[in-house]
């Protein structure tokens, strides 16, 4: 890998993203990962769990779903409004696409399709701890926030 990332999974993604990374991006930023401290079955618990399965970083104390983008950005994660990879964390603003009106929602990108649509996996939409999926059009997907690495 050409990347300077310590995490080999991040290094592979960075190589794919050459030329797109924010200026001065440091892939070895503090991840904030001290284990899964989110309540079992919540959307935040699943987002952390799935990222761990994929070998990607996620903070243990990003707060309520609505605050994940800001919390991640503050630690140095690359956060923007474009789904790029399987494993990206999708942050839904409160009320967006059926997200809770106060807490918001987070999920994980499972597919990024050629037409810009995405398929996500998520927890606590169909019941506590129930993992389900949804697909969003490119237009819908472009309205959300994504935490990459």
What is the meaning of each model-derived region?
Residues 1-3:
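N-terminal prepro-regions of secreted/extracellular proteins
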Residues 7-106, 111, 122:
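Secreted/periplasmic proteins that engage bacterial cell-wall peptidoglycan
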Residues 110-149:
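Aromatic- and glycine-rich peptidoglycan recognition patches
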């Amino acid at each position: 890998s050409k990347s300077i990332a310590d995490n080999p999974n991040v290094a592979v993604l960075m190589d794919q993203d050459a030329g797109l990374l924010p200026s001065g991006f440091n892939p070895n930023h503090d991840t904030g990962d001290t284990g899964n401290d989110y309540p079992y079955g919540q959307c935040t618990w699943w987002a952390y769990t799935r990222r761990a399965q994929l070998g990607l970083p996620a903070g243990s104390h990003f707060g309520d779903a609505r605050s994940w983008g800001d919390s991640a950005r503050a630690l140095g994660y690359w956060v923007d409004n474009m789904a790029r990879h399987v494993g990206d964390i999708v942050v839904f603003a409160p009320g967006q696409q059926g997200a809770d009106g106060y807490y918001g929602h987070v999920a994980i990108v499972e597919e990024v399709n050629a037409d810009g649509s995405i398929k996500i996996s998520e927890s606590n939409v169909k019941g506590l701890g129930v993992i389900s999926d949804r697909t969003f059009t490119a237009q819908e997907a472009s309205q959300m926030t994504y935490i990459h690495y």
